[in-house]
């Protein structure tokens, strides 16, 4: 692992809304547009390499926005991809404070394979999902509407009941609709541009390295214990 596991997340209390998407889907831009802050969610210079989970308070400490690591970037080593697929599934299915998932997908290439896998995991966890067709400014109005219609048809084929909207971080289009959906999940009136950055963050620097090392040691111990039990 090159990053902490979800076991290092804050206590599983309150309400969380997670943002997920492929490494080039515009996730950081969407979060920054929603919060009206340019660098609240930072984009890595190497897409897919940033494997930090970032938490931000939304109004109070019991309501959080969770910025999940981007997925699907080809240059990421296969072993790292497998590790994070396991972690993402565990988080989506078992995190009791998770109230909803905002899934971002590029309107020009919507619902790639791993996007659909994320939706299946969310369904397994009975988690509501709101889909953003990002970068809507890249298409003309008619093409955007067709993409929206076709994505709805695909969701129906998959047997998934998700809300969906057009979104443009560049033009700040769709912010109020997104804030309304999140507000319902938070059970809290939420306004775009008024999300407050959390005073806490996950570990960084040497503390992060220590946490990663401890987690790796614990995983090895668990595997050895399991192997010993099976051999008896």
UniProtKB/Swiss-Prot annotation:
Pfam family, one: MMR_HSR1
Cofactor(s) in the UniProt record: Mg(2+)
BP terms from Gene Ontology: division septum assembly
A Gene Ontology molecular function term of the record: GTP binding
Residues holding GTP: 21-28, 48-52, 67-70, 134-137, 167-169
Keywords: Cell cycle, Cell division, GTP-binding, Magnesium, Metal-binding, Nucleotide-binding, Septation
Domain EngB-type G: 13-188
Protein name, per record: Probable GTP-binding protein EngB
Annotated source species: Psychrobacter arcticus (strain DSM 17307 / VKM B-2377 / 273-4)
